[in-house]
């Protein structure tokens, strides 16, 4: 019997028997019938097929596929205590454990694959280049590096591609948590500070971090927490966002140092980051290439922050209780507490 003569319910099962995403795409493009049938494929099946093509087509692995799919598991877990515990357990095994968690509970659509693949060239790679100029080889190649060439010289072992995806993953994971603080009247659920900190603790390898249950980082040269802490505290990071805010949101926006910065400015920067890939388009894409949808969303975020009467509450961490972390997503201070081992 010819393939296309099979009943529709049988054709719908075909994607589950394919070996990878290339076979899926080739079959879907072979004729209109299969294209229409494959359009109904479950997101979990598409993610499994994409995983079978990694790392050849989705690198760096596993960060790229985690960035593409982690919002789906965040949505699945948010507001459910038992599911949030499973998510935190996944964090504690590192990024590969989080990847496995995404495969088990998450999913991808073809549109999301296309969107993320395009974002690699328009957003992720340009962001990686900017981070390399803040903390990587380009930064350390600045003339007179140790003698005034940069304002914050340091010795860092930085993988800029990995760092870009790590902060994008954070935004994709906790974007809806920020929405809860932008819309306080709606009483939306959010992940708490501890859950957010555990992402940094376990999913960013660092040889000086105590949060390494299997000892895998003991003799490594990973410094991912230290690197991201440096980036998020740096003046270049603030200036990058300030330039985008002036371009798209407020031509009169000014950039002060962290001590003098109004809480709304920091919250705006964090809230744009918490849009994930969409938010980073503001700083990574050329101004004329930023989608209008991303600009409109950013303006809505700005307006909601301006409408807030007071900043979100904070909690203090550390032995002396001197490290404040906002109850709203606060990546700079969360990774700072994680790196400084102030839990003990």
Predicted regions and their residues:
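Short helix-loop-helix/strand-helix junction enriched in hydrophobic and basic residues
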Residues: 7-14, 22-43
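Charge-dense, extended regions
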Residues: 192-344
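Charged/polar low-complexity intrinsically disordered regions
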Residues: 42-257, 261-262
